[in-house]
């Protein structure tokens, strides 16, 4: 009975790997993390007013960042934004 359970577990893990591996290589991931260029602009939770750039799906656009929080789709310059996301 023990070998049957082991074989079942190996089969299950193999199928799970085959099913999930292509998703890990999809365009929504970059170096194992969700591609930040696809995230919406996020002002953050603080009240400061910093000019930042985010990728909107086509190009880089300005937005006002509050100074803390937010997500990875914020860049200090348009050039930095385009370098990271221009080919997204």
UniProtKB/Swiss-Prot annotation:
Chief place of localization: secreted
Cellular compartment(s): Secreted
Disulfides per UniProt: 37-85, 46-68, 60-81
Top-level division of the source organism's lineage: Eukaryota
Chain positions listed as propeptide in the UniProt record: 28-33
The BPTI/Kunitz inhibitor domain, residue ranges: 37-85
Site (Reactive bond for trypsin): 47-48
MF-aspect GO terms: potassium channel regulator activity; serine-type endopeptidase inhibitor activity; toxin activity
Tissues of expression: Expressed by the venom gland.
One GO-annotated biological process of the protein: envenomation resulting in negative regulation of voltage-gated potassium channel activity in another organism
Pfam families tied to this protein: Kunitz_BPTI (PF00014)
A GO cellular-component term linked to this record: extracellular space
Signal peptide start-end: 1-27
InterPro entries per the UniProt record, alphabetical: Kunitz_BPTI (IPR002223), Kunitz_BPTI_sf (IPR036880), Prtase_inh_Kunz-CS (IPR020901), TFPI/VKTCI-like (IPR050098)
CDD domains for the chain: Kunitz_huwentoxin
Keyword terms, alphabetized: Disulfide bond, Protease inhibitor, Secreted, Serine protease inhibitor, Signal
Family statement: Belongs to the venom Kunitz-type family. 02 (native) subfamily.
Function: Serine protease inhibitor that inhibits trypsin at a molar ratio of 1:1.
Protein name as it appears in the record: Kunitz-type kappaPI-theraphotoxin-Hs1b
Lineage per the UniProt record: Eukaryota, Metazoa, Ecdysozoa, Arthropoda, Chelicerata
């Amino acid at each position: 009975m023990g070998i049957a359970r082991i074989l079942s577990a190996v089969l299950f893990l193999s199928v799970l790997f085959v099913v999930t591996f292509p998703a890990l290589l999809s365009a929504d991931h970059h170096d194992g993390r969700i591609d930040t260029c696809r995230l919406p602009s996020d002002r953050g939770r603080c009240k400061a007013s910093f000019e930042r750039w985010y990728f909107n799906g086509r190009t880089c656009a300005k937005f006002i960042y509050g100074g803390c929080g937010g997500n990875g789709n914020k860049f200090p310059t348009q050039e930095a934004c385009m370098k990271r996301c221009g080919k997204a």
